[in-house]
Curated annotation (Swiss-Prot):
Its main location: membrane. One of its GO terms (molecular function) is symporter activity. Belongs to the HAK/KUP transporter (TC 2.A.72) family. It is found in: Cell membrane. The keyword Ion transport applies. This is Probable potassium transport system protein Kup. PANTHER family: OSMOTIC STRESS POTASSIUM TRANSPORTER (PTHR30540), POTASSIUM TRANSPORTER 6 (PTHR30540:SF20). Transport of potassium into the cell. Likely operates as a K(+):H(+) symporter. It comes from Streptococcus agalactiae serotype Ia (strain ATCC 27591 / A909 / CDC SS700).
Length: 666
């Protein structure tokens, strides 16, 4: 997945327009497959709907797309870019210094967005495959829902299985396919609208408001739970800002919006003209002439796969950002593409696959899945509204205007949340359970890191310069390695983790020519790659602070190679010639990376709550990437040392010597 060139971020191009269609609009663009079907089924079927119901439903869809997608996301949220990156975690990095509690909406929003990513592929692919029921030559096969489920699971298995290889080649087809899809939505919807041209009156919000309070509406205000399905992809639109640029979204959204609205109008007109067609039909596929149905099902399936791919890739990006912000466990990641935007996280991939397939097997039909869909994303949108309000205040927007915006969208999205909450007992509990589980994991990881940073002891490195220099020249000890490198996330100025000095001095003393202490600091900018060096007035101690953006790979060995070369060229680091080497001109000696594997001991004297957090974090850590993989050290010389997380002085346990009393004979 490519990232837009920063110089053209606000510009639009023909190529960018097509790319945006393939990346940004998959979710929102496939909503016509199931939204109208959900509305009609909740009303009692096609035979139960009236003209006022159809006009009101389409009106509510149009104004939901306008208020939430167009105004909130396209016009407001897209301005909240973190160095041209969007999404809830990018937004959080912009405002997190304003108040500590903003971590709460960030974690909740990220978790619910991730849980939504597990449901979207299930709904979209199942809806598309169910279209085969109206293909005359295949009806005898796919009228049996078990065959629909089998085909859906097969497509999902292929989709998740190819993630490890990246989408570089086939990804180039996504844009053109989605252009054809949206063109089809618009044209077919427009042509179907001639069956009942009155549907275009739905642009008047009066019909939507009238339906909400009309006795004809069997669901009352809870109809908004189905209406919301039309705009679930709005959050993904913001998340993909960095991939296509603001300019291309601004230009492509009107085209997409018109195509989607025409599709809803066409379906509505067909329903009013065919009220005796049968209650089990999906209006989207039923409104297509039979000779084109097979072609449309294939196109819809491709669009559903592209939408699912966008959600899966978005989930990888979301988790990757959370890991670098230290609010998510560091799972093993690979980069199958040629550019930094393509990330593959095996644990997340197969977690999503397991959840998605379980949802298909549990709910069986797209209609039942729709009953669970939308609840999680309403929570994400509410959390985005909170963070967005703080961003606008930070940018100097008048607090009164920000308050009005927050109240307006808070009430609007709150109503959608309440309308969707009724879905909880009809399947919504599944995504809520997933979201709560993710929130639990993120909270444990975040709190655990805070506990460690609060208790772990730091030492002043200046106090040990003499010992390190003496060790370098102590002939009683053999040379351990020319360069010894310690990676640490706890280095503040000259203060360094006690475990590191314990490893060098108190265990088998590690004699080296140069001691390196490398600390990685993740910046709020996504693509920073800078470093700072402090040699503390010596030529044998090198403190390195690596400043890497939250989207950058933390491949330390490759960055260190560049730093060493620059230090040698500047003369700050003495040359380290090798006697034996395939490179006679080599100026650098051998390197040994020391990775400290910190283990929590249950014997530590912590409060019960803190003990529980640390025990849970230790359990989760078994599933995470090793530091060797995380820091890209697979092909380097590495020693892993297991050290305890020492929160208090390690005192001996009380014990007394047993003395045997001996008696002597008279």
């Amino acid at each position: 997945m490519q990232h837009v060139n920063h110089s053209s971020f606000d510009k639009a191009s023909k190529a960018g327009f097509i790319i945006a269609l393939g990346i940004v609009y998959g979710d929102i663009g496939t909503s016509p497959l199931y939204t109208m079907q959900s509305l009609v089924e909740n009303q009692g079927g096609i035979s139960s709907v009236t003209e006022s119901f159809i006009l009101g439903s389409i009106s509510l869809i149009i104004w939901t797309l306008t208020l939430i997608t167009t105004i909130k996301y396209v016009l407001v949220a897209l301005k909240a870019d973190n160095h041209h990156e969007g999404g809830i975690f990018s937004l959080y990095t912009l405002v997190r210094k304003m108040t500590p509690w903003l971590i709460v909406p960030a974690v909740i929003g990220g978790a619910t967005l991730l849980s939504d990513g597990a449901l979207t592929p299930a709904v979209t692919v199942t809806s598309a495959v169910e279209g085969l029921k109206v293909v005359p030559s295949l009806q005898h096969i796919f009228q049996n829902q078990s065959n629909v489920i089998f085909a859906t699971l097969f497509i999902l298995l292929l989709l998740f299985a190819i993630q490890r290889f990246g989408t570089g080649v086939i990804g180039k087809l996504f844009g053109p396919i989605m252009f054809i899809w949206f063109a089809f939505l618009g044209i077919s919807g427009f042509l179907n609208s001639f069956a009942h041209p009155e549907v275009f009156k739905a642009i008047n919000p009066y019909y939507g408001l009238k339906l909400l309070f009309s006795p004809e509406n069997h669901k009352g205000i809870f109809i908004l739970g189905s209406i919301f399905l039309a705009t679930t992809g709005a959050e993904a639109l913001y998340s993909d800002l960095g991939h296509v640029g603001r300019g291309n979204i601004h230009v492509s959204w009107p085209f997409v919006k018109v195509a989607i609205i025409l599709s809803y109008c066409g379906q509505g007109a067909w329903i009013l003209a065919n009220k005796n067609a049968g209650n089990e039909l999906n209006p989207f596929f039923a409104s297509i002439p039979s000779q084109f149905t097979m072609h449309v099902v294939i196109l819809a399936t491709l669009a559903a796969i592209i939408a699912s791919q966008a959600l899966i890739s978005g989930s990888f990006t979301l988790v990757s950002e959370a890991m670098r912000l230290k609010i998510f466990p560091q799972f093993r990641s690979t980069y199958p593409g040629d550019n930094i935007g393509q990330t593959y996280i095996p644990v997340i991939n197969w977690f999503l696959f397991a959840i998605t397939t379980s949802i298909v097997l549990l709910f069986k039909t797209s209609a039942h899945m729709e009953a669970a869909y939308g609840l999680a994303i309403t929570i994400t949108m509410l959390m985005t509204t909170i963070l967005l309000s703080f961003f606008l205040i930070q940018k100097g927007v008048k607090r009164g205007l920000v308050l009005l915006m927050m109240i307006f969208f808070g009430i609007l999205e709150g109503i959608f949340f309440l309308a969707s909450a009724v879905k909880f007992m009809h399947g919504g509990y599944v995504v809520v359970i997933i979201a709560v589980a993710i929130i639990f994991i993120m909270t444990i990881w975040y709190k655990g890191s805070k506990i460690v940073s609060r208790y772990v002891k730091l030492l002043d490195l200046k106090d040990y310069i003499g010992q390190l220099d003496k060790l370098r020249h102590d002939h009683r000890y053999p040379i351990y390695h020319t360069n010894v490198v310690y990676l640490t996330n706890r280095m503040e100025g000259d203060m360094i983790d006690k475990s590191i000095m314990y490893s060098i001095l108190d265990k088998r003393p590690k004699k080296a020519q140069v001691y390196w202490f490398v600390n990685i600091k993740v910046t709020d900018e996504p693509y920073t790659a800078e470093y700072k060096v402090d040699m503390m007035g010596t030529d044998f101690i090198v403190k390195v602070e690596l400043y890497l953006g939250f989207k950058m790979r933390q491949t330390v060995s490759r960055y260190l190679r560049t730093i060493v070369e620059e230090l040698l060229e500047s003369g700050r680091l003495p040359k380290q010639g090798k006697t034996y080497s395939v490179r006679p001109d080599s100026k650098v000696g051998d390197f040994r990376f020391i990775v400290l594997d910190e283990r929590f001991s249950s014997s530590q004297n912590l409060k019960p709550g803190e003990r529980f957090v640390m025990l849970m974090k230790s359990s989760i850590k078994h599933w995470t990437a090793t530091p060797i993989r995380w820091f890209g050290l697979q092909f380097s010389e590495v020693t892993t040392e297991v050290v305890p997380l020492i929160f208090t002085a390690n005192r001996g346990l009380p014990i007394k010597e047993k003395i045997e009393l001996t008696t002597t004979g008279d």
